[in-house]
């Protein structure tokens, strides 16, 4: 297939391409692309971007052909904000960092953080009273942010850092998406939002540097992630990470771990509120497994239905946009792509494709029963990516979600407020614009 015969997404605007659609109606836009073909030409401004809608092609770029792809030009824009940590690293440097950090993020290594997350969830709910209106979107994002901060920094000197991080990270995340998609001329205009972003970005960098310096001076292993990052050594060379690299890895953990986890927690409680039968089954399972005791790591594997609820939430509200760029010429779906070509894929669009997920807008945890789940094609369900760049924090995210859901639902149920319209907002992740609910003790 010649390049000029690749189907073009409809609705492009001269000079802006499909940028307005990507900014204003991103979810509708990416889910519509499958109607055009397996490879679809999208334009961001004047930059061509090839969207992949077939799971086999997406799996190829993430696994068998991953060495032929870099992060792409759009991701390069994001590096100015999120740094050069594992989530933006490429090639040999990515392999080195992954090798250094992988032992820190195994599920057994993460199991020790169960109590940390549980205590934070308990502290959040202790402020609730019967019938209280709870801003679930804000509360769950704050819970996730505090959990990530405490998993990273457990020392007493971290208390100020946690407060700065809680204040700054949401401001930066709100700006990240626009910095990736909009021309630099537009993101450089000194608006109030831009000034807030610059201030938050500078404060976050400063507090991370201060934490690293304090840990270096005090030494020792506090059992947190920062201690382990500072101590991580290459088993062959004995090399450790520079302070600058540790800084960028800490920065990456906040950007990768906070927004998605907070949004998923909020969506879990939204879906439970919308489906009383599903909520009842979750309550019954948690009551039976915990029997009135605090949730522990050994309980997590027994919460099978709760796990399926979380998996279905990942399907419904996954990230909607990931860019890549070709490093060498290759063919995808009959389309020849020269080196330097930008491509994209959308987990959200794949997860809402009725070819792979019947009734994709229906929240159905039992679609993840083993006999049904095995019918999902490889590459069609990728909430954490796949291959060499699969999310290193997957185990931590699943532990955080399961512990938080079990801890909260053991004592409380969150009921929807009649007449409230919950709108999906796509920035880096898909999160609720506002989600007020009423807290009722169980």
Predicted regions and their residues:
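Cytochrome P450 catalytic-core helices
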Residues: 260-285, 394-412
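Cytochrome P450 heme-thiolate monooxygenase catalytic core
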Residues: 1-7, 70-78, 89, 93, ...
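Short, conserved phosphate/pyrophosphate- and ester-handling motifs at nucleotide-, phospho-/glycolipid
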Residues: 54, 257, 340
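Cytochrome P450 I-helix active-site segment
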Residues: 5-12, 114, 118, 166, ...
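N-terminal membrane-proximal hinge/A-helix region immediately C-terminal to the signal-anchor transmembrane segment
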Residues: 1-96, 111, 115-123, 159, ...
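Conserved cytochrome P450 K-helix/beta-meander segment immediately N-terminal to the heme-binding cysteine loop
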Residues: 67, 345-373
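Conserved cytochrome P450 K-helix E-x-x-R motif and the immediately C-terminal K′/meander segment
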Residues: 16-37, 206, 293-333, 354
């Amino acid at each position: 297939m010649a390049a000029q015969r690749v189907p073009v997404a409809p609705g492009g605007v001269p000079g802006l391409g499909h940028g307005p659609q990507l900014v204003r109606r991103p979810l509708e836009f990416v889910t519509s692309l499958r109607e055009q073909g397996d490879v679809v030409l999208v334009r961001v401004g004047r930059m061509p971007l090839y969207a992949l809608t077939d799971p086999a092609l997406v799996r190829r770029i993430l696994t068998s052909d991953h060495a032929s792809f870099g992060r792409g030009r759009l991701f390069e824009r994001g590096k100015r904000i999120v740094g050069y940590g594992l989530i933006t690293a490429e090639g040999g440097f990515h392999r080195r960092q992954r090798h250094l950090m992988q032992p820190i993020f195994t599920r057994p290594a993460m199991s020790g953080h169960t109590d940390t997350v549980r205590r934070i969830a308990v502290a959040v709910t202790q402020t609730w009273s019967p019938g209280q209106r709870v801003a679930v979107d804000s509360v769950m994002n704050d819970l996730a942010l505090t959990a990530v901060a405490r998993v990273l920094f457990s020392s007493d000197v971290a208390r100020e850092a946690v407060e700065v991080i809680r204040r700054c990270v949401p401001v930066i995340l709100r700006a990240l998406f626009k910095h990736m998609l909009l021309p630099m001329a537009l993101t450089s205009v000194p608006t109030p939002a831009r000034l807030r972003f610059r201030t938050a970005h500078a404060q976050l960098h400063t507090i991370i540097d201060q934490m690293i310096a304090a840990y270096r001076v005090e030494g020792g292993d506090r059992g947190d992630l920062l201690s382990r990052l500072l101590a991580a050594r290459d088993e062959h060379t004995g090399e450790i990470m520079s302070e600058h690299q540790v800084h960028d890895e800490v920065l990456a953990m906040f950007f990768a771990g906070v927004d998605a986890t907070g949004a998923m927690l909020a969506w879990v409680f939204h879906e439970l509120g919308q489906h009383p039968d599903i909520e009842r089954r979750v309550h019954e399972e948690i009551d039976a497994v915990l029997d009135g005791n605090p949730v522990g790591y050994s309980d997590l594997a027994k919460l099978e239905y709760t796990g399926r609820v979380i998996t279905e939430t990942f399907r419904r509200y996954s990230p909607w946009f990931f860019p890549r760029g070709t490093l060498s010429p290759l063919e995808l779906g009959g389309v020849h792509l020269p080196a330097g070509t930008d491509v994209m894929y959308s987990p959200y669009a794949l997860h809402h494709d009725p070819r792979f997920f019947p009734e994709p807008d229906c929240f159905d945890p039992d679609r993840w029963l083993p006999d049904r789940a095995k019918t999902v094609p490889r590459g069609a369900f990728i909430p954490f990516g796949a291959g060499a760049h699969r999310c290193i924090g997957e185990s931590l995210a699943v532990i955080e979600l399961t512990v938080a859901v079990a801890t909260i639902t053991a004592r409380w149920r969150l009921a929807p407020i009649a007449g409230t319209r919950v709108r999906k907002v796509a920035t880096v992740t898909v999160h609720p614009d506002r989600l007020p609910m009423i807290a009722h003790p169980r």
